[in-house]
């Protein structure tokens, strides 16, 4: 279907000239923002949603600790705790991430300054940013609240995520990574199911990407638990690029498709338990080296073997064959897509442009999938009355 010429983005200046969290909301800023948004290939619905978010954001003004009321805890990890909060002056519901750091004021100020880049990150595939500030020993990052939570939470309820749904997830992740790279020259650095957020409108967005080098350095010691999604080249301490994010996406897709973290691979017996039938393929083979393998504590599978020690797991990622999807359960296109993401040599691994034209992505893009309906029935959410773009089954 040919794309309609997008109508210009309409952004109205805040009536009282209030600041967008400390930055001027002068009309020149709005014009620059309007121009950037028009460069993005958005459909009508995406354009309207982004427009609505940015118009709401103008009403927020400077963020202060006293202006928030805690509603509930959404999750913890990556060195911080995330709360669902109400921003009393605007009445908006937000997600507020609190990161406790024992750091000097100069470092703290640099982190807040670097986080301001997030104001420029406006894409349907990136979680919206309201602002960042420091208060009582904690850095607060205030974001759009995604009512479906993260895909690791969805996976716990679903058991496994269907291939058609993962097709839509793959498109959103590739488009989000492409946007970060092309428009902001940054890579994500931490792609995993808990950093892919979803909502009842059927939107899929990336969060927690490495925009602040100083924050990455300050939190270096808290990243041990997430190393299981890191690429072999990154674990070996060699140069890494956005190709590393592609490995992490591939690993995440295998985990969500199979229903458990895929290293070490499930054996034939476990695959039979997971899928309720005999499953062929490499994933069912015994790990190549004699060892006492097991799964990391974070997986959701039926593997009764003792969990792998973290050093053993990292050694496995670097030295053993990469995970694969079991054949006979998933389409050949999906299997090939994952294989191209999980090539150990980053120079041979598919890049974002190649993945965007892969047969699996082309097929997934053409498929009508009610992502919002599937999500809401899986996790018990009420679906909003406005149908999602892909929900016209």
From Swiss-Prot:
The UniProt record lists the keyword Repressor: no
Residues bearing the modification Phosphothreonine: 286, 292
Membrane topology (UniProt): Peripheral membrane protein
Species for this entry: Mus musculus (Mouse)
Modification Phosphoserine occurs at: 218, 222, 298
Post-translational modification: Phosphorylation at Ser-218 and Ser-222 by MAP kinase kinase kinases (BRAF or MEKK1) positively regulates kinase activity. Also phosphorylated at Thr-292 by MAPK1/ERK2 and at Ser-298 by PAK. MAPK1/ERK2 phosphorylation of Thr-292 occurs in response to cellular adhesion and leads to inhibition of Ser-298 phosphorylation by PAK. Autophosphorylated at Ser-218 and Ser-222, autophosphosphorylation is promoted by NEK10 following UV irradiation.
Protein name listed in UniProt: Dual specificity mitogen-activated protein kinase kinase 1
InterPro entries: Kinase-like_dom_sf, MAP_kinase_kinase, Prot_kinase_dom, Protein_kinase_ATP_BS, Ser/Thr_kinase_AS
Location of the Protein kinase domain: 68-361
Deleted gene: phenotype: Affects fibroblast shape and impairs haptotaxis and adhesion-dependent ERK-signaling.
GO molecular function: ATP binding; MAP kinase kinase activity; MAP-kinase scaffold activity; mitogen-activated protein kinase kinase kinase binding; protein serine kinase activity; protein serine/threonine kinase activator activity; protein serine/threonine kinase activity; protein serine/threonine/tyrosine kinase activity
Keyword Cytoplasm found: yes
Gene: Map2k1
Membership in a protein family: Belongs to the protein kinase superfamily. STE Ser/Thr protein kinase family. MAP kinase kinase subfamily.
Any one GO BP annotation for this protein: ERBB2-ERBB3 signaling pathway
Main location: cytoplasm
Region (Disordered): 1-27
Enzyme active site: 190
Site (Cleavage): 8-9
């Amino acid at each position: 279907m040919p794309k309609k010429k997008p109508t210009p983005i309409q952004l109205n200046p805040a009536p009282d000239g209030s600041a967008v969290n400390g930055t001027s909301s002068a009309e020149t800023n709005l014009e620059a923002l309007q121009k950037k948004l028009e460069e993005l290939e958005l459909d009508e619905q995406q354009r309207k949603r982004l427009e609505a978010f940015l118009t709401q954001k103008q009403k927020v003004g400077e963020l202060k600790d006293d202006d928030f009321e805690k509603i509930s805890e959404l999750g913890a990890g990556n060195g911080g705790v995330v709360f669902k909060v109400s921003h009393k002056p605007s009445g908006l519901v937000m997600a507020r991430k609190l990161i406790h750091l024992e750091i000097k004021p100069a470092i703290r100020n640099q982190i807040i300054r670097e986080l301001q880049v997030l104001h420029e990150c406006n894409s349907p595939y990136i979680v919206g940013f309201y602002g960042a500030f420091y208060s009582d020993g904690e850095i607060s990052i205030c974001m759009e609240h995604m009512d479906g939570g993260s895909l690791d939470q969805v996976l716990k309820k679903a058991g496994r995520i269907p291939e058609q749904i993962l097709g839509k997830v793959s498109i959103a992740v590739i488009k989000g990574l492409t946007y970060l790279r092309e428009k902001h020259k940054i890579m994500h650095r931490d792609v995993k199911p808990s950093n892919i957020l979803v909502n009842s409108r059927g939107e899929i967005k990336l969060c927690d990407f490495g925009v602040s080098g100083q924050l990455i350095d300050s939190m270096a010691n808290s990243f041990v638990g997430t190393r299981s999604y890191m690429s072999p080249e990154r674990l070996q301490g060699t140069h890494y690029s956005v190709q590393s994010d592609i490995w992490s996406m591939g690993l995440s897709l295998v985990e969500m498709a199979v229903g458990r973290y895929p290293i070490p691979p499930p054996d034939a017996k476990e695959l039979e338990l997971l899928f309720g039938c005999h499953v062929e393929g490499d994933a069912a083979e015994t790990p190549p080296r004699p060892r006492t393998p097991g799964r990391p504590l974070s997986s959701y599978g039926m593997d009764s073997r003792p969990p792998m020690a973290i050093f053993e797991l990292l050694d496995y990622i670097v030295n053993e064959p990469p995970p694969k999807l079991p054949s006979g359960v998933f389409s050949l296109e999906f299997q090939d897509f994952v294989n191209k993401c999980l090539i150990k040599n980053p120079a041979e691994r598919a890049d974002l442009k190649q993945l965007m034209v892969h047969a699996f992505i082309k097929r997934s893009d053409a498929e009508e999938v009610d992502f919002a309906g599937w999500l809401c029935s899986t996790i018990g959410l009420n679906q909003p009355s406005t149908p999602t773009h892909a929900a016209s089954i």
